């Protein structure tokens, strides 16, 4: 066989594989955020949550199987569902009251959202086998595990077990002052970044990337809402299962 033909076939196959495994483009992310059927409440929330850099930071791919922990009203859940598309799936975990997420899932554009009512200590439903998930997200609620009495070590181990090797665990939260750990979770609703990182890494995760797009170095971090009013200092961490 002609060696140039073989070389061309190898390059073509590699290119196809790259396209299949590649993350969605910034143009596609902009289209997702601008989707006309997104709610007015979500669009208002965009101003604070900055969905475009967040989705780009996560590194989403079409067809991913993900779980959004503490999904609440489903703001992040819906964005991820739009990104992974109908060939993917997004489990929306909540400890109770899944009605708002169930309402979102009625939209055909995000009908692949699966509400899951599970405790934080044991968030992964039995239909998800070990090494099955591509992505787990937890947006601005890890700190709440402190005053809620959640067994955080058990939670982190459960997330680790559910992810595929190479799977990602993306955590965002409100930044606390050095030395405060999780002690201000029920008052200022903040957590020390280094403390969170240490707990997650203890489950076997490795820190892959830090996102700075929600940082505000002018926030003194001594109140729940900064005074004078300003954006909170918030961190975003991407962990990977080796």
Roles of regions detected by a PLM:
Residues 13-15:
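C-terminal motif of bacterial Sec signal peptides marking the signal peptidase cleavage site
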Residues 17-19:
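Bacterial signal peptide processing site
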Residues 28-57, 61:
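Class I SAM-dependent methyltransferase Rossmann-like catalytic core
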Residues 63-72:
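Conserved class I S-adenosyl-L-methionine
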Residues 81-82, 151-165:
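A short glycine-rich, Lys/Arg-flanked "PGG" loop and its adjoining helix->strand segment in the class I
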Residues 125-136:
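A short acidic, Gly/Pro-enriched loop at the edge of an enzyme's catalytic core
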Residues 166-175:
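Conserved beta-strand signature within the Rossmann-like core of class I S-adenosyl-L-methionine
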Residues 219-242:
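Core SAM-dependent methyltransferase catalytic element
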């Amino acid at each position: 066989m002609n060696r140039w033909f073989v070389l061309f076939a190898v390059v073509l196959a590699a290119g196809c594989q790259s396209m299949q495994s590649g993350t969605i483009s910034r143009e596609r992310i902009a289209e997702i955020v601008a989707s006309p059927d997104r709610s007015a409440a979500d669009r208002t929330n965009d101003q604070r949550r900055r969905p475009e850099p967040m989705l780009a930071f996560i590194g989403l791919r079409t067809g991913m199987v993900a779980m959004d922990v503490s999904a609440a009203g489903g703001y992040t859940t819906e964005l991820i569902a739009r990104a992974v598309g109908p060939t993917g799936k997004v489990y929306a975990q909540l400890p109770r009251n899944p009605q708002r997420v169930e309402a979102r899932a009625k939209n055909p554009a995000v009908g692949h959202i699966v509400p899951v009512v599970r405790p934080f200590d044991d968030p992964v439903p039995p239909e998800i086998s070990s090494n099955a998930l591509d992505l787990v997200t937890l947006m601005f609620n890890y700190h709440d595990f402190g005053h809620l009495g959640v067994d955080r070590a058990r939670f982190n181990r459960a997330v680790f077990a559910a992810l595929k090797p190479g799977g990602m665990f993306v955590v965002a939260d409100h930044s606390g002052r050095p030395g405060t750990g999780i002690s201000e979770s029920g008052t200022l609703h903040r957590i020390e970044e280094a403390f969170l990182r240490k707990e997650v890494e203890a489950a076997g995760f490795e820190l892959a990337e830090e996102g700075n797009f929600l940082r505000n170095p002018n926030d003194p971090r001594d109140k729940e809402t900064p005074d004078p009013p300003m954006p909170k200092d918030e961190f975003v961490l991407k962990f990977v299962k080796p």
